[in-house]
Structure formats: structure tokens, C-alpha cells
Amino acid sequence: MDSATTSGAMELVAALLRGRVPPELMGGDGAEGRALVATLAAAVLGAALFVLWRRAAAGKKRKREAAAAAVAEATEVKARAAKGGEDEKAADDGRKKVTVFFGTQTGTAEGFAKALAEEAKARYDKAIFKVVDLDDYAAEDEEYEEKLKKEKLALFFVATYGDGEPTDNAARFYKWFTEGNERGVWLNDFEYAVFGLGNRQYEHFNKVAKVVDEILTEQGGKRLVPVGLGDDDQCIEDDFNAWKEALWPELDRLLRDENDASTGTTYTAAIPEYRVEFIKPEEAAHLERNFSLANGHAVHDAQHPCQANVAVRRELHTPASDRSCTHLEFDIAGTGLTYETGDHVGVYTENCPEVVEEAERLLGYSPDTFFTIHADKEDGTPLSGSSLAPPFPSPITVRNALARYADLLNSPKKTSLVALATYASDPAEADRLRFLASAAGKDEYAQWVVASQRSLLEVMAEFPSAKPPLGVFFAAVAPRLQPRYYSISSSPSMAATRIHVTCALVHETTPAGRVHKGVCSTWIKNAVPSEESKDCSWAPIFVRQSNFKLPADPSVPIIMIGPGTGLAPFRGFLQERLAQKESGAELGPSVFFFGCRNSKMDFIYEDELNNFLEQGALSELVLAFSRQGPTKEYVQHKMAQKASEIWDMISQGAYIYVCGDAKGMARDVHRVLHTIVQEQGSLDSSKAESFVKNLQMEGRYLRDVW
């Protein structure tokens, strides 16, 4: 309805209300005509008012959107200007620049990088510290060298995960850096230090940090202190603090004047805190929300997951088993999400209701309390320097925030204990918390918190007077709940609109006596599929690419080793091979070593594996049952029995794939493979080791381990 039409309608209504009825409307019986006129007047008036309301509402929406866009643009311009101005100021006033790089998977490396930068800013007022995500440092690979040549002093915080791999945000830099041997010596004026984050239980402990440190030295860089080897299996914060204390004297030498008055200044880290505003429920509905879950996003990643419904869920173990393993299918039709065989899926799920209710009780907040959360002040300037991570979307209720974004079940870090101590009203509890976080309390923290696997909520229950405000709780006490990664157990050739997950339930008793239920595995086990209810479960998910891929040539032989849920990617492999065979491809030999406890309890996908054998996608299935029969048999034992066949396949160019537990199974399999190569190839130990390493370098020995 245009403006002319609206105007005409209003004139007609006005005429009717004044009693002036157009003659053309008064045909026939007078009473009937008057009734018709009254009805028409009401209808026209209603339509006109509706149009005016829509126009006013649209105008308000456009104003809100324009205001929001203006604020966003102003904020971005302000940030760019501040960032550029800071760099220019550093160059103009002669202050030295220190770049602090980080490569992080869960946020710990980023947290250490920002914490060090904050403390360094307080120690060295004549230097500027800039914290940089390695992935954001260069838009193109070629820019890495160009930019690094301009750096004089840099600190690297890099984590290692999986099978000695870099984190997602460091992968591009690491690939460029490790493949550039032809650069020679080019970092002559470059000084650096590296701190690594890893877990000593894994075979390639801190591999990424060690490699980066070694190559920096080889290419001319000057190492300030030995590479720091943070061990998350113990207390990685202690490792970080020890490395940091060794670093300060070197930075003092480079960044301080002899008469610097701040030399003896004691630094006390501020407790990070988001700005939180509590709002009424009726106000929450009028505020814009940005959950970053809109399906059809150009790129789905950890920051931009898509919403996927659970289509299928079924138990894979038999009733005779005392454990549980779930087959789950996410429906990705219409989401824009795609995957390849061998990829991983990242799943964001929620803490279970009883855990959330306990957190609400300990914090003292009503579950339905609405609030907004911000990393800046009301005037737009950032809070706490640069140490705060971007907050989660809001407005949100306390219950939903605790369910979706707070890691409540892992053991608290020492920085969390310090934050709790600050807000403990009982002096004795505050002192105890500070002691556990101190160097003097190192052994007790290691025993009472780490070894006992006490969760954050268990620790908070022991210190009930510690009730931090929400802004502190989410910034300094509870880490952000991280996505859980699973090897996709399907192939798009067979299931293009579904992502299959094979998940073992985590349900165990900790040394402190708590029954620990895995956050994601519990959610998966209890998920409601769409085949059972229209009100089905859903989760934000995304795909992470993997190099765990079948050979490009399907005729190349493959050896697969994957007990338990390590079967997952191989189910996808075999679906892919079956599709290739049905398309006329000639398949090479394939053998799969699978293990479980008992064929009557946890032999998952048994019928499917037998079908792959019958259809020719799989040549041989070798089974190992650890709790069936007089002796325990594992996949590595079966490999030793098949040593000759394995060596023959390797000699024919076979690819070897291992999936499953990194701490036990993968190590044992690696040792057996080394023995097979040594004995079957008549090689000494060092040559056998070189042979296996070459297989890895050639991409013929791949591992998907956790």
C-alpha cells in the first residue's frame, strides 16, 4: 500500500466518521447499506493503522540497525586507529617493540602470552608489547618472511596437540616456517624466546615449540633463554612462571636503562573482570543478540559454528556391557557445512543440569537472572588492557551462561584460586586459597587439586565464602567451555548430508570420590534424535580439516589399526572405498586391526565390518579381544603375529593408519611397527627408526590420536 493509497483510505474513513457516505456505497436497502458502510469503515481503518504501524516499526528497526552499524564501524575504526597509532608512536618515540606471538587450541597459550605482556608493560615503560595471533600476523604466506625481517625481539607461545601437530591458528605459520629450509641464515638481528605447551604423556611432547626454537636458531636468531617446556600433565602454570623468571633478566638487559627507577617494582597482576549489566527479562527481548549460529555462514569454524539437529542416536554396546558407546548422526542438510572422509567434527555442548544448578548455588545467583557482558567500558575503551578474551553473546540468563560457556568440571588453575581468594569473605579461606596458588603450596596444589582431579566446583564447595561477581567468574575463575573433537565416522560419498560420530561415554570415579561424567559424551548419550521427536536435540558444530586421508590412488594398499572408538575414521574410509568400488575403481589390499574387550559386549559395527568384507571394500579383518579367552590380546599382539604380511604390504607402498589412545595403544603400536621393520627388513635399530620416520615424512604413516 503506497502513500497515496493510505491517504485515500484515511480520507474515506474520515468521511464515514463525519457521516458523509459516498452515494455509490448506498445502493439497495438503507439499513443494509449502513451496516455495509460500518463494516467497511472498520476494515479500512484497521488496514490503514496496520500500514502506519509497519512503517513506524520498520523505521525504528532501520534506525537501530544504522546505529548498531555506526557503533560497530566507529569501534573498528577506533581500534584500528589506536593500534596503528600505538605502532607509529613506538616507532616515532624510539621505544623498542616486542611482538608476543601465540598459537593456541584451548586458550591457554593466548592467556600466557597476554599475561606476560601485561606484566612486561608494567616493568618496561620504554617498550611496547604487542600480542599477535600467528594466523592473523600475515594474510598470505609470503608476508611472514617480509614481516619477520622487521622484527627485532619476539616471544613465541606455541602449543602442541594430537600427534605432534600445531594448533589450528598456528598451522599455516608452522607449515611455512618448517618448509622454508632454502632461506638460510636471515634472522641475524633477531632475538627471541619460545615457551611450549604440551603434555609429557604424549609421544611428541612439545614438538612444535622445540622445532620452532631449533629453526629460529638455525636461521640466525639469538635465543634469549632455553625453550620452555610446559607440561599440562602436572602444573603448566609453574612451568610458565619458572620460564618467565629466567626471561626477565634478559629482557632487563635489553629494555631497561641503568637508572630505570622501576627495576625493583613488585608486580601484582590485576584480576580480570568483564563489565556485567543486569537487566530485566522484558528488556532482554528488545536487545540484539548475535549467537554466530546462522546457518549459511560463508565459513563454519570454531568461531562460527552452525546449528545441526541430531537425526539418529543408537547404543552400540550390547546390554551385557557395563559401558556405553553411542552412534550419533548430525543432520547438516541445508547448513552449508561440508566435510571430507577423515576430517574431525567440533561439537559445542552444555554442562548437565545438576552441574549447572550446583554452580548457581555456589555463586549465589538466581538461574533466570538476565545480564549482558562486555570486554569494554561504557565509553568503548577496553577493560584490563588486552588480556580479556571476547565475551560470549548476551543478553543471557545465568543458567544458560553457566551451561554453555563455563568449564566447571576441570581442575582450576592457580590463577583461578587467586581470583577466588580475592572474593572470599572468610580470611582463613582466602589465606588457604592463596597458599595453594603460591610457590610454597606447589606440592599441596599438585596433590590436593591436580592428582585428586578436583573440579572447579568441588574446590568452590570447599571455600563457600568465595563468591566472585559474574564478571570475575567468567573472566578469571572459569575457563571457556571448549568444543570436543571427534573423528568423523562416515564418508560424504555415502552420507553427504549427515556427519556420523562414534562416542564412548566417559563415566568414572575420580581419586577424590566424585563420579565424573564427560560433558559432551553424556550429552551425546542423552540426545533426543529427530526420528523420535520433533523437539530434537541440536548442537553448534563445525568441521576441522585433517591430513588423515586415504591415498589418492585407491589401488595403493592400506593398513588400518584402531581399537574401540579408534574404528571411527576407518568406518568412513571403508564407506569411501565401497563407493569407489561401486564406481568401478580397482581397490588395493586393505587390512584392519580392530580390538575390543569382548565380542559379545563391545564389538561395535560388527555387521557393517562383515558387510565391508563381503563387498570387497575390506580384504582382511584381524580381531583382538582383551577380555575373552585365557590371555589378553591387543591389536599390537596381532600385528606381531602378522609381521610378514605387514612388511610385504609396506614393501608394496602401503599406507599405515593408527587411530585411538595416544598414551598407551599408539605407543605400543609404534614400538611393534619399529620391531617389524627392523626384523623383517634385516635392519639395525637406528636404520629401522630412520625407515619409520621416512614413512611419516612421506605421509605414509599417519596417526589420529588423542
Swiss-Prot record:
Family under the similarity heading: Belongs to the NADPH--cytochrome P450 reductase family. In the C-terminal section; belongs to the flavoprotein pyridine nucleotide cytochrome reductase family.
Identification of the protein by name: NADPH--cytochrome P450 reductase
One Pfam entry name: FAD_binding_1
InterPro entries per the UniProt record, alphabetical: CysJ-like_FAD-binding, FAD-bd_FR_type, Flavdoxin-like, Flavodoxin/NO_synth, Flavoprot_Pyr_Nucl_cyt_Rdtase, Flavoprotein-like_sf, FNR_nucleotide-bd, NADPH_Cyt_P450_Rdtase_alpha
Cofactor: FAD; FMN
Binding site for FAD: R484, Y485, Y486, S487, T502, C503, A504, G518, V519, C520, S521, W706
Annotated function: This enzyme is required for electron transfer from NADP to cytochrome P450 in microsomes. It can also provide electron transfer to heme oxygenase and cytochrome B5.
Domain FAD-binding FR-type: 303-551
CDD domains (UniProt xref): CYPOR (cd06204)
